[in-house]
């Protein structure tokens, strides 16, 4: 309808008016398309008066926009940069996962991570192992504070119940224990939280120490019954070292919770975890029958096994806390 109306108006006009109307429309169309063409083409096809008029208009708006652009460029450059980076890297997400959040929360955020608590336990064991290497195996300060014995316990060094669980002398001993801690401890921490892993580690160390002292006390009582008393009995250099109790507690709890999961045994054979429970059972039977030569290590392991069974029973009944 609009096109028909325009045609009727155009036909109804006189010839001079029609000529002016066509010329005006052509100039407007050329002016609207002049910015799309190169400068030489626009100057070639557009009349000079149209070009000069458009240049004046363009100069007016360019001056206004240029001043605004300068203000934005020099006055608000930091705000524009901040807006750009905020769209790429949100401040909330970066703070929660970057170094800023770590600096604000400190060691609490680090210890709350599953891998962080495992790494911390490994570092603690490695530090005590280094102290044994530097100070020597015969250093009395290390023996009194990082080895559990009847002498250290009777002289009031109760902290050796826990510190002996971080103490290793042999390189093979610490490597095997830390491998088990990293493999099974990380899964326990992810399932129940890092605090639960710490509690389980300390409970395993305490359980192994209690079993060691109980066995030592029973052996002394039996010797007294047979009237065989060693000279200076309090200073008998029989002590407990190593994280066998904590590692056995963590390993066996993981096996009891996930018995059908397959894992690498001896870093070579992929076998079900339940086979590890069978191997631990044979070890305990040999120890009870007196066929195991290293009775002190087996007692430490037995303490960890008891702690794992108690923890597994509490988990099944829902009586555990993170």
UniProtKB/Swiss-Prot annotation:
It holds the Pfam family Rhomboid. Keywords: Chloroplast, Hydrolase, Membrane, Plastid, Protease, Transit peptide, Transmembrane, Transmembrane helix. It comes from the Eukaryota. The keyword Lyase does not apply. The keyword Membrane applies. InterPro entries: Peptidase_S54_rhomboid_dom, Rhomboid-like_sf, Rhomboid_protease_S54. Rhomboid-type serine protease that catalyzes intramembrane proteolysis. May cleave the plastid translocon component Tic40. This is Rhomboid-like protein 16, chloroplastic.
């Amino acid at each position: 309808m609009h096109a028909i109306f325009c045609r009727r108006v155009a036909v109804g006009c006189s010839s001079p008016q029609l000529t002016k109307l066509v010329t005006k429309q052509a100039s407007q169309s050329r002016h609207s398309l002049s910015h799309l063409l190169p400068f030489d083409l626009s100057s070639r096809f557009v009349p000079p008066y149209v070009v000069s008029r458009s240049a004046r208009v363009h100069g007016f708006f360019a001056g206004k926009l240029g001043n605004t652009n300068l203000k934005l460029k020099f006055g608000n450059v930091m705000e524009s940069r901040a807006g750009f980076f905020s769209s790429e890297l949100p401040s909330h997400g970066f703070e929660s996962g970057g170094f800023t959040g770590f600096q604000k929360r400190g060691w609490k955020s680090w210890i709350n991570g599953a891998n962080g608590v495992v790494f911390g336990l490994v570092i603690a064991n490695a530090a005590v192992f280094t102290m044994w290497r530097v100070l020597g195996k015969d250093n009395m300060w290390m023996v009194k504070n990082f080895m559990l014995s009847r002498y250290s316990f009777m002289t009031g060094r109760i902290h050796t119940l826990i510190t002996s669980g971080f103490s290793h002398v042999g390189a093979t001993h610490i490597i095997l224990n830390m491998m088990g801690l990293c493999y099974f401890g990380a899964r326990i921490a992810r399932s129940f939280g890092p605090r639960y892993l710490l509690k389980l580690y300390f409970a395993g160390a305490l359980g192994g120490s209690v079993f060691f002292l109980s066995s030592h006390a029973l052996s002394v009582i039996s010797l007294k019954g047979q009237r065989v008393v060693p000279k200076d009995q309090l200073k008998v250099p029989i002590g407990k070292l190593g994280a066998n109790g904590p590692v056995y507690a963590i390993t066996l709890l993981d096996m009891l919770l996930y018995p059908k999961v397959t894992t690498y045994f001896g870093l070579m054979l992929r076998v079900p975890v339940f086979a590890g429970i069978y191997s631990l059972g044979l070890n305990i039977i040999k120890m009870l029958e007196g066929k195991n030569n290293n009775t002190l290590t087996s007692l430490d392991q037995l303490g960890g096994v008891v702690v794992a069974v108690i923890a597994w029973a509490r988990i099944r009944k829902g009586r555990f806390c993170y």
